Amino acid sequence: MNNISPQAYVDPKAKIGNNVTIYPFAYIEGDVEIGDDCVIYPYVSIMNGTRLGRGNKVYQNTVLGAEPQDFNYKGEITTLEIGDENIIRENVVINRATYATGKTHIGNRNFLMEGVHISHDTDVHDYCVFGYGTKIAGDCEIHSGI
């Protein structure tokens, strides 16, 4: 059973898994998938094109699936895929891909501390830790365990 605050905005087209908690003032657009057992804290924005696996915790003021900060972006439908059991702390921004043929990808069991920014078309593997305020430019690959 889900626990979705009536003060959260969840587009009726969004696909929400089982046992998901969404706190007040979260904003979730229609082309979004949230897997089972996720927790979405207050003031999180999850934008179109974002896919969250299961067991993720997304903390306050985070923006997932923001448009890429790239002059080459022309408004194509692009994606951000996030795996399972990630901890995404406060004020994190993760951008979607620049082109429809690419994607931004975050693997499993990563820990993104406060203020991290992961730019467009980046591929983060599994078990990575990003310290406070880390900024990753677009088109990067971060291997497991970094």
Report the location of each language-model feature.
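Structural signal for interior beta-strand "rungs" in well-ordered beta-sheet cores
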Residues: N3-I146
